[in-house]
Structure formats: structure tokens, C-alpha cells
Amino acid sequence: MPERVFSKEESYTMKKQLALVLAVAMVSASLAACGGTSTAPATTAAPAETEAPAETAAPETEAPAETEAAAAEEEIPDAASLLSDAFIDPVGDWAQYDELIAQIKAETDMAHRTELMHQAEDILMSNYAVVPIYYYNDLYMSKPYVKGVYANAFATKFFMYAEMENGSDTLRLNLASEPDFLDPALNSSVDGACLAANSFSGLYTYNAEGKPVPACAESYEVTEDGLTYTVKLKEGLKWSDGSDLTAADFEYSWKRAVDPKTAADYEYMFSGFDGYDDGEINVTAVDDTTLEFVLAAPCAYMEDLMAFPTFYPVKKEAVESYADWETTPGGWCQEAGFVSNGAFVCTGWNHDTSMTYEKNPYFWDADNVKLEKLEFMLSADDTAIYSAYNSDSVDFIDSVPTDEVAALIESQNPEFYVVDELGTYYIAFNVNSKLFEGKTPEQAACMRKAINILIDRDYIVENIGQTGQVIATSYIPLGMMDGNGGTFKDDPAVGYFDAYAINEDYDGTIAEATELLKAAGFKFGDDGKLDPSTPIDIEYLTNESSGHIAIAESLQQDLAAVGINISIGVQDWNVFLEERKNGNFDMAREGWIADFNDPINMLEMFTTTSGNNDPQYGRK
């Protein structure tokens, strides 16, 4: 990565000063991409007592009446005229989007299906409640004696085949802070998926090459029409308590995942199953080792679904042994000792501090599991995590303080890894936020569009991300397959907006944002900022992490250029997830790493009833 000319602190100072320079001196300036120095000339005040020569003095003239009238009454554009033709009301008309997603999932013509998915993204991006920032990659650090850890493109890390070349049988690591849920049906976070993948086992899993391969399944057959699957399970499958695991456990678990009482965020993953619309998916345990299920339409990514945590089995007796299991469906695994079927079993849990997982002797592939124990440090404090790594208290960490990234890259530290991921870091607006009270749907969209174009993404990826992230101009990430043998998007220059305009045409971008906000009913003062009579005050929600907080602070500076105020609320991980899910925010930091390589995964999460619909689309 090329060096930056400015330090982080200098860059922040430049951004803070820029709005002031523009206001008092009307100087044209631009923020440099990839470290270029500022070329804006210094302002020069005119001598206070110099008279203009008589022959060059402009004659006194009277402004025509038309000019006075134009100055007195500024023409404000209609908000709808500033939006895409794809725009629909994200609350009142969102049923159209829901219907489009249902059509995509039922479509058997793959070329037409791809066209429909592009239409869905057009709608999604036209209302600016989802504001893409960059396409993800992943960084982590691992001691040189740790071997065999691998990850897929969906950010799940697998430790079951890791080995320690330092003679230890224990891997000490940090992934995140206290997990929200360990019940695989209820989890919706990346760290939770990692814990689930190492303590539960589905029909399929992923190998070191990132390909889905059989796990509890021995094989499967599918009918010629692509609708009916018959899966044969491996013989002798066991739960961690030594009891038999059968096809009936999968039937129970899948039906439980779509039961409204379970309230699984990912229940819509089963929406392609026959019977889903009637509330009873078509899945049957034919016998102890045979599972049959029927789809409503062919699914090209069925193996990925069979490897996804929501499709993992849970033991009915364990789930229902919890006293309040009907009202607290995840209560059965809120403490150590719960029954699972993966490579490791949770045997110790000091909440908010540590977790211990030990090898499960009943795991179907236990002979190939070399580690005896995983010891997790639970923390979101990346400075403390990095310190623990450097003091050899942990062997593997999944986050690094923002301030340390540049030095790690420059020194080519062999313990520092950056790997590709399939996902997008973005900002979400709550479409029902008080920010938009009294505004038409079009005016609210203009507000969000103005904020979108004011964001300096180049600064974020170069100074905060620092690991080669690609600026996002669409929600669907680069490289995602289109379900028809091609890629949905493979050119970063093609997108829904010019992400570099704020750098290359600062004055023009500020003017465009101002026009959008005026169309939304806001007034501006002579200083080019919002008039106090029509303020915009935004509460921005994020979780603990130096990188997320730095991005929030960068947004704070960007939006201050037109007088928008942002207050940053930093919350613990579990509280953050709950507040965001319940729509208790104006703006929130978001990120979505694909669960499988098909755009529908990124699009169906925004249907009205989806448990991952944080922007509250379609909800009133």
C-alpha cells in the first residue's frame, strides 16, 4: 500500500479546516486520494486602503427587477426530480420489493433471475437507506506455530483441524466480545457463526479451499426437476452427550427455525422450501439416516444452505429442558455444558471474560481433530487484544487497532494476514427515524442521498481501513456470482454514484448536497451551512472498536461541511445488536458478509419480515 503523505491526525485536521476555508474564503480545494498533498492556494486579503483606478471603476447600475425577484425567491427543485426512477416509498410501497424477492426465489430462468436481482438492487439503492462504504476484506494475526486454521469467503473461521507446533494442545484466541447467541438458529453475527461452526455440525461444512463438502451427510440425491432432496446421513452420528443423532433431529431443528415462537432472524433462509408460505416446511425424517425435503423452486446454492448455522441440528431434549424454553428459545445454551455435535463442546464460560471449548470425542471426525482445547478471550477492546497477542497471552486474534495497521503492513509482519471476503461495510438509516418526521418519502430520500455523497470514502479506506479495501458504489460486493455462470459485478468503477466526487469536485458536491437538502425543506445561511431554524441532528450508533469509531468520527467531519450534526453512541456488542435490530437509531454502522455466493442473500435480508431488516423497510 502506498504511503500517506499526511498522518491520521493531520488528515482529520485538514478535513475540519476545509469547511471553514470554504466558508470564509470560497477557496476551491480537494482532499487528496492516496496521499497527494493539497494544492489549494493560500488566501490573500485585498489591501484595505487601495483605491481602484478611476478608469476601471464599474459604473453604478440598478439591478433589473427580474434579477431582484430571482434573488428574492430561489427556485427549489422538486424532491422527486432528484431521485432515480427506481425509487419507491421504503415504508408504504415496500410490498413491491417483497414481491420482487419472492419472484426471484421462484424464478427458474437463470438469466431472467439475474435481471430481476439487478432490479432489486436498483430499488434498494434508490432510497439511500443503505449507504455502502467499502467492500470487505478480513485481517487477523496468528502465531507462526499455529497451523491449519482456515476461513471461507463468508468470514467463518474453522479451528477443528488446527495444530500447534509449539507442543501445546490448546489454541488461545480472540474473535470478539461476549456472543449474543450460541443457539445456531438464533445467531446472526459473524463471531457467533464461527463459534457455531466449531461446536455444531450440519449436513455440510467448508473445506480449506472454501468449498462446501459433506459433514453429517454421507451423500444426497436430487430429483431431475431440482426440487426433492434425499440426504443419507453418516452412520453412527452422536450428540456430545453420547446419545444418537438422527434425521429426526434435523427435521425438528429446521421446523423449529421457522417457527414464529423461535423468532430466528434467519428463518427466511427456508423461504425457498415447499410449504414455507403456509408455515410448515416440507422436510421429513424418512428413517434414522434419511432426510427428505422439498423445495418450491430449484436452488443452485443448496449445499451452502446445508452448511449454514441456521440449518444445524439442535437436540430437542436439550432445548426443551430449559424451564422457559417457549418464551426464551435460546436459553438452553446460555451457560457452559450444553449439548452440541461439533468438534468442540463448551465446558467453561466466564461471561464477558472467557470461554473454554474442549474436544468432543463423539464428533463424527474426531480422529482428525488434533487440539484438545480452545480458550477464548472475550473482548472488543482491540488495544487490549493486541497487547495480549504481543505478550503471548493469545495465539490468534481477529482484530487489530487501527493505529497499528500501517506499521504491520510496512514491516511486512509475517504474522499479519489480509484475506478476501465477500461482503460490504455500509451505513444504515432507520427509515422510520424521527429525522424524517414531516418529510415526504422523496424528501427523506433526498436527505439520505445528500449524506451519501458527502462521505469521503477514500479517506476511510486509506486512513482507517488501510488494508486495500475497495470503495463501494453498490451494495452487492465485487466478485459475487450472478447465479447464471457469471459475476454480478466485477468493475469497481461501475456503481450507483461517484464515490470520488467529494475529492475531485468538492465545491460541486457540496452544492449538490445543498440542493438536495433544500429540496427536502431545509434552509441555509450565508455561511453555506444549515440555518438554525432547520437543523439536522443525527444519532449514530456503533459498537466498541477503534475502526468503527474512527469511521463515525470521519462521517462527523464530512457532514459538518453543510452543518449536519452527528452525535456518536458507542455500545457493547450485545446491546448494539439489539438496539439496531429494534430500530432504535437514526444511523448505524452495518456490515454484511455473504452467507453464500449469490446476490439473493444480500437482497432478501431487506424484506419487510426479515429478522435482519435493520433499516425497518416496510414497517410502520
How does the language model describe each region?
Residues 72-171, 350, 454-490, 547-556, ...:
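Detector for C-terminal structural segments
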Residues 65, 70-73, 80, 110, ...:
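Ligand/substrate-recognition segments at binding pockets and active sites
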Residues 470-520, 544-549:
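Structural transition elements
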Residues 251, 361-407, 565-567, 572:
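Ligand-site clamp/hinge motif
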Residues 145, 221, 267-321:
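Surface-exposed binding/hinge segments that line
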Residues 218-266, 286, 292, 388, ...:
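Aromatic- and charge-enriched surface segment that lines or borders ligand/interaction sites
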Residues 132, 140-141, 174-224, 339:
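N-terminal lobe/hinge region of extracytoplasmic solute-binding protein
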